[in-house]
Amino acid sequence: MSDIESLNGGDLFAEPSDFYKPPPEPHFATYTRDDVPESSTSQQKDIKLRLVGSSPLWGHLLWNAGIYTAKHMDSHPEEVQDKLVLELGAAGALPTIIAGLLGARKVVSTDYPDADLISNIQYNVDHNIYGGEELFKDEEKRSKQMANRKVVVEGYIWGNDYEPILKHLPQDQQKFDLIILSDLVFNHTEHAKLFKTTKDLLRENGKALVVFSPHRPWLLENDLAFFKDCEEFGLKSDLIELTHWKPMFDEDEETVEIRSSIYAYYLSHI
């Protein structure tokens, strides 16, 4: 008998039929705007988002914080309309799309420069803002196309050089009126980079909208430290609201009160 045959006559080193599983396919989620403000540039109510099949960066889910952020923006269109808006860690990019539909002057939607994640954000922008029109493959045509768009997508690592972001703004206005940080607070090791990016890119009288849910109840203290530690970077926090929704996951009943929480804050310059 061959050394590489199993006792039942098969190949000892053959991979089982289910050894390699292809990554999950992208899936779709639809968000319906409750009350579209009359001043909204677009009265579109249904937003169909494509979400990546899986992501170590958690971009494959439509989080409660993102939905809350979208509702907040529709309820306060004056914070968005004709404003320069930046979203950090956009994932499915629901707040980005709401900002575009409301009539922001410019929206720069960013997330970690993972090819699948960024192309998925671009897909959602293309199909919800631009009627399915995709970006040109030709670099020169693509550049002109992006220059004419009010909503653009960029890969960006927090705290790095700002050129990929600022190139989309007018030369005489290199700051944002509104910066969106939706469900990013859980990245405790990245707080300093988020503070620096926010401080550097937020205009003097601008606001950062920070919304999060405590996905790890035992680390809530670390989450909330974000809103005190920001002072070391010249930023102050103001609580907008603490509310409760059905938590994203069915887990320990003892922690449901914490996991159902949604915190919303403004950050601004001290």
From Swiss-Prot:
GO annotation, cellular component aspect = cytoplasm
What is this protein's record name?
Protein N-terminal and lysine N-methyltransferase EFM7
Provide the alphabetized UniProt keywords.
Answer: Cytoplasm, Methyltransferase, S-adenosyl-L-methionine, Transferase
Cite a single GO MF annotation.
Answer: N-terminal protein N-methyltransferase activity
E.C. number? 2.1.1.-
| Family, per entry | Belongs to the class I-like SAM-binding methyltransferase superfamily. EFM7 family.
Q: Tell me which CDD domains the record gives.
A: AdoMet_MTases
Where in or outside the cell it occurs: the entry states:
Cytoplasm
PANTHER family recorded: HEPATOCELLULAR CARCINOMA-ASSOCIATED ANTIGEN, PROTEIN N-TERMINAL AND LYSINE N-METHYLTRANSFERASE EFM7
Q: Which residues bind S-adenosyl-L-methionine?
A: W63, G89, A90, A91, D111, W158, S182
Q: What is the first-listed, main subcellular location in coarse terms?
A: cytoplasm
Q: What does this protein do?
A: S-adenosyl-L-methionine-dependent protein methyltransferase that trimethylates the N-terminal glycine 'Gly-2' of elongation factor 1-alpha, before also catalyzing the mono- and dimethylation of 'Lys-3'.
Sorted alphabetically, the Gene Ontology BP terms of this entry are: methylation
A Pfam short name: Methyltransf_16
